Amino acid sequence: MIYEGKAITVKALESGIVELNFDLKGESVNKFNRLTLNELRASVDAIKADGSIKGVIVTSGKDVFIVGADITEFVDNFKLPDEELVAGNLEANKIFSDFEDLAVPTVVAINGIALGGGFEMCLAGDYRVMSETAKIGLPEVKLGIYPGFGGTVRLPRVIGTDNAVEWIASGKENKAADALKVGAVDAVVAPAKLKEAALDLVKRAISGELDYKAKRQPKLEKLKLNAIEQMMCFETAKGFVAGQAGPNYPAPVEAIKTIQKAANFGRDKALEVEAAGFVKLAKTSVAESLIGLFLNDQELKKKAKHHDEIARDVKLAAVLGAGIMGGGIAYQSASKGTPILMKDIREEGIQMGLTEASKLLGKRVEKGRMTPAKMAEALNAIRPTMSYGDFGNVDIVVEAVVENPKVKQIVLAEVEDVVREDAILASNTSTISISLLAQALKRPENFVGMHFFNPVHMMPLVEVIRGEKSSEVAVATTVAYAKKMGKNPIVVNDCPGFLVNRVLFPYFGGFSKLLGFGVDFVRIDKVMEKFGWPMGPAYLSDVVGIDTGHHGRDVMAEGFPDRMAVEGKTAVDVMYEANRLGQKNGKGFYAYETDKRGKPKKVSDPEAYELLKSIVVEEREVTDEDIINFMMIPLCLETVRCLEDGIVDTAAEADMGLIYGIGFPPFRGGALRYIDSIGVAEFVALADKYADLGALYHPTAKLREMAAKGQKFFG
């Protein structure tokens, strides 16, 4: 053994060839933490010191190659002063450069996922052989940063600037065939042949059949683009990517600027340019928020995994109530491998559900994400029925009938009598108390809420609601089923609106107050979209449905009368009374026309403005900042209350619920991280400025206590 550590070993194979193997002890994946980096330094030094070594192959002892840097460790480094962070980055890069400069040929065998620092390690090798099933990429822009271990330097010199810009700015994962096509790897082989192929390649380089020094040289030099080519390539790319990423996500454009700045430098000077830009991005609030989201997501996955220990396997599911929602749930279940019965009392409902599922599956085939054979298999896994005849073998039933407590109770009691005693019942309700619905059941311990968001196939969140009598097995089984469906489940406790809708309606309450002061809803939409929301509150109301919002508002007002009760008529009331229900009937705050692609397109409608005149209580001048505060303060304070009331267990879950469920701007990190970014004391003072607007704007006693103590929700 030439070197033996806890993350890396270097051992002799044959004919002067050694194998550098990444296999981090005690972990399921390889990642670049401090230990691995230190051992890579020691491994490279050991190889350099051994004159008998003629070639190196790099392998992994895990199912993945290397998933990237250990964010939990490196995020602490981002708090260091700039010069220390730059120095640390360059020190790490020196390890990769020393590996690249070894006096012998190097071949990297990519057996599985190689992302971020993992792929940057691959780029430092002379040759790369990739398994057919592996994926490679540089996803750092999704964390608000860009590659920091030489990715912006080596990738353009390996696959060309245009391809590198696309890979780095998009952060996408790339399959083996695509990687081979652009020259990111030199060969693609079956998984079982990978090591053999790597050995063959290194032997050919040792024998001189392949000129590894010539292969290495372009990575050490400046980019082969003249001034005009550089200008055309970089300026066009910056313009296009800026348009795609928007002003709130600077990392993709900064990555292109870095490649451009380093274009005329050799490797070592180019790495200095990369390090300087990397540090600049690492210090931004966007990076802090997006890295925070990544860590929150990891925390959620760990919690969801914990549920697996007691969850029952779901081999057959059922959905009650077909239609668009039922069809969406059936599609999601069947397309992810769980057969499902779809029951409705009406033939039209069944037909609508099947049409929805078929349409969604057809779109996947059109986009090349599914074969026609797989589509047929998924459609066959949806079994439409108008009776309970086959329900005896069902493991979980998702009730998705009309949002009416009496109807839901009747349907749930009915299905409870025909399923096995251990079958789980789950209600897809958005506002109705799970404990209330459970009163109709003989086995309330087997009952939970399972709130899908519309459209089911697009929205990643599922709220799993624990009622007063819900068992942990019922909760765990529902969480496991949601994960199996490809969703991100969050467990919340029962209350009106649960987490997401309870937080969303105070946001709409702020919108209602602005309209009462005569503020133009189009202006409000523009301000909130600029703030980072995918759509403003007026447009969102139309998309959700004014009738849905009206009903939800009444449920929330009944649940929290101290702050959500409504005095007098509101915009939602006048729209509802005028039968302006939003996109579903072509008119709400906006009117809707069909565009060339058959999609609804919003246009201004004088009738809406006329209706809204009746609910103006006083004309008030407000700034754009006021609009943001009117909307965001109630949302943030209600999120705080949900955490304090134990509706959600952690700040991470609360924030991820809002990101996944209502499209909270990811670059702001979630409601609680948004408060942290302002400062808890500063946020409390800001809320107090709007105290005259009512209880929705009044901070809790505990939040005031946090402000006084200088505490934060994160860190």
Swiss-Prot record:
Q: Where is the active site?
A: 451
Residues the entry annotates as binding NAD(+): 325, 344, 401-403, 408, 430, 454
Where are the residues marked Important for catalytic activity as a site? Answer: 120, 140
Keywords, comma-separated and alphabetical: Fatty acid metabolism, Isomerase, Lipid degradation, Lipid metabolism, Lyase, Multifunctional enzyme, NAD, Oxidoreductase
Amino acids binding substrate: 297, 501, 660
Under the heading PANTHER family, the entry gives: TRIFUNCTIONAL ENZYME SUBUNIT ALPHA, TRIFUNCTIONAL ENZYME SUBUNIT ALPHA, MITOCHONDRIAL
Task: Outline the subunit composition.
Answer: Heterotetramer of two alpha chains (FadB) and two beta chains (FadA).
Question: What's the protein here called?
Answer: Fatty acid oxidation complex subunit alpha
Whose protein is this, by species? Ectopseudomonas mendocina (strain ymp) (Pseudomonas mendocina)
